[in-house]
């Protein structure tokens, strides 16, 4: 009976350790992907807004005095962002 109890306890311990390690790995992957996406979005927003303030493909994103963006651009925080 002692052997069976010891085997059951060891099996549960191994399962808990395995589960914790797998959860840690998944959490680490989620953090890495989230940070990568946030960086990409920030870079894209900066690139689009900076390009839009100057000109994109030789034409301004917004016509003079217009508040709406055109040609696949969308206004976000007073900048044109490529959709």
UniProtKB/Swiss-Prot annotation:
UniProt KW Secreted keyword: yes
Query: Which organism does this sequence originate in?
Result: Chilobrachys guangxiensis (Chinese earth tiger tarantula)
Q: How is it modified after translation?
A: Contains 3 disulfide bonds. Two different connectivities are observed in similar proteins (C1-C3, C2-C5, C4-C6 or C1-C4, C2-C5, C3-C6).
Which tissues does the record link to its expression?
Expressed by the venom gland.
Q: Which domain of life is it from?
A: Eukaryota
Q: According to its UniProt entry, what is the function of this protein?
A: Probable ion channel inhibitor.
- The principal localisation class reads secreted
This entry carries the following GO cellular component terms, namely:
extracellular region
As for subcellular location, the record says: Secreted
The protein in question is named U3-theraphotoxin-Cg1a
Proregion residues are: 24-44
Which residues pair up as cystines?
48-61, 52-75, 69-80
Keyword list, A-Z: Disulfide bond, Ion channel impairing toxin, Knottin, Secreted, Signal, Toxin
Q: Which region is the signal sequence?
A: 1-23
InterPro entries from the xrefs? Hwtx-2-like (IPR012625)
Does the record's keyword annotation contain Transferase? no
Q: Which PROSITE patterns match?
A: HWTX_2 (PS60022)
Annotated GO MF terms: ion channel regulator activity; toxin activity
């Amino acid at each position: 009976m002692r052997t069976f109890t010891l085997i059951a306890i060891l099996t549960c311990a191994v399962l808990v350790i395995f589960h914790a390690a797998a959860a840690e790995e998944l959490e680490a992957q989620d953090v890495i992907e989230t940070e990568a996406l946030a960086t990409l979005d920030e870079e894209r927003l900066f690139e689009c807004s900076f390009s839009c303030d100057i000109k994109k493909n030789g034409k301004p994103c917004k016509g003079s005095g217009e508040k709406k963006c055109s040609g696949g651009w969308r206004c976000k925080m007073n900048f044109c962002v490529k959709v």
